[in-house]
Amino acid sequence: MLAALLAAAAAGAHAEPVLQGKDAYGDWRADKPGTVRLIRPQDLVRPGATRSVASSSRVVPRPPEAQLQVPAGFKIELFAEGLRAPRIIRAAPNGDVFVAETRAGTVRVLRAGEGGKVATNEIFASGLRQPFGIAFFPNGDNPQWVYVANTDSVVRFPYKAGDLKARGKAETVVASLPDGGHSTRDIVFTPDNKRMLVSVGSLSNVAEGMGTPPGGMEAWAKTQPLGATWASELERGAVLAFNPDGRERKIHATGIRNCVGLAIQPQTGLPWCSTNERDGLGDDLVPDYVTSVKEGAFYGWPWFYISGNEDPRHAGARPDLKDKVTVPDVLIQPHSASLGMTFYQGAQFPPEYQGDAFAAQHGSWNRSKRTGYKVIRIRMKDGKPTGEYEDFVTGFVVNDTEVWGRPVGVAVAKDGSLLISEDGNGTIWRVTSAPR
């Protein structure tokens, strides 16, 4: 009854105009399923156009009248509750749902029963150090390992389909990842199973106090990957690459302040990042983004953002990089805190959803207007992003100061439904599409 009460009525089916320019920024009051936004590099405001504001939300218990909103033709229901701040969720090939409970140091396995509700709930592994990313290796229907990205390492467990408990102790694959600061580490494998990609966020906001690189700037730039940082930010604000056994470590891409969510795009095989950009430049800078990540590319942080826009806090520091910044594919409302992402490959949603991406927006703290706290759909056309994104699930915000949910993870279940975790009240929600 509770789940039915909280399951939302679908939003209207009429087409919404695309919000562009300053209209695309807005706040939570403009959010509803079907609202489409397009933020372009030329729409950016100047740094300091508004003052930087600390405005964290207060997480409250889920109100009895709370209703999540989804597009017409969809339904959303409670899938699991009572979890310990669930973060990243990943569906195993057999249909089991693996959940990272980062604060608790555990990875949990959920198995659905009749009616799509959780019937089995077991701790797969415990004693982990802030686990976040989860990946099954090798890709395909018969993985032999479950990899877990801790905040300071990557470990793996031997696995057979249907395991509810780890069948062996954690084997360390990568013994040392940069620790502290932005602590989430996500993990994916390339389609050919040859490389393991791990995202590592920055230690700081904009590399404050990084100083001068060893040997001087000119020598550093000649010998290191494009845009590589050093000292306290060494191998940070980056995606790292390894062999599946942890060897042949290298930097895959740089300048990505905090790639919280990693996913492989099925059509291209390219990794994508869901990224938290920097704070402190005002309400409407800098847009978060979701983007494909090309090997060897530099995405700007900390010296530049969204092309060659220089961060005033690093004025004149790296003129050699100004024209070498890769522009992200899809810009998101600033300070939305874009976290987990996935690509839709299921058989349940309408055909126009095939290949589109979903990303969880955890919600703002550095904006005077409450922003985020929703799940968005990122539109693709022939495997390429249009630059537009639309609100897909809204309703986590109670008022200007309070929220009851903060979306973190998204995953496509074996039956084609979309699962969404939120760590405010420890729940996972399931979006289904009506038969067509």
Where are these regions (language model features)?
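Beta-propeller domain segments
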Residues: P17-P71, P143, T184, S202-K250, ...
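Blade-loop segments of beta-propeller domains
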Residues: G82-R87, T106-N139
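Beta-rich catalytic cores
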Residues: K75, A85, P93, R103, ...
